[in-house]
Amino acid sequence: IADWSGNHIQTFSEEIRRYPSIEEMCLSKSGIIQFNLRTMVLKDENGNELNYTLGQYEGDSTFLKVMKINILQGLSEREALKRYSTPVYINEQYARLLVPKGENPVGKPVRLYDTEFGKMEKEGEPIAIIAGIVENLYTGTLRQEVYPSLTYLTHTPPYNLVQIRLKKEHRAEALALLQQTWEKINPNVPFEYQDIYEEF
């Protein structure tokens, strides 16, 4: 459920958190459907340029759990947020393409492996540090290679999305209750949601 103004999503999430029909939820600045993409140019061993699409996700400390993305190596989300101002998880594909074989990237700056990323970091802002490696998340078609991706953990609003995992039973009633709550908090914006399972 999105509110691109970021004005009401926090209030909405606090209101619905107590609903028994909600299994898990997280706040995020981008989702698995609405996420940022950029082109990443790498060179093969012969010096030929290869273009890749890099996916970038951003959510709170429960984002990986709600999306059922497992951490394969590195810190837990809680530990990462304690240790780093801007913790980032790289996926298996990112590690395969950018991290030298046998090297442990955890605790190192993202810009060490991705020079374009370093150019985009703003002066005076905390450096993005790799907190761990997560499993690949397939968001394209079965014919597309999985995107290398970065997942940022954040604890600072504004958030634009609340992503909810509903319990299977009473789903229709749960959606009706979410709509009713949304209309009470945010009456001027229509209630709209995307079902990830339907989209994919």
Please place each PLM-identified region on the residue numbering:
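Structured, solvent-exposed hinge/loop segments at the ends of secondary-structure elements
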Residues: 1-96, 101, 114-117, 126
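"Rare, low-scoring activations can occur
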Residues: 6-26, 92-93, 115-200
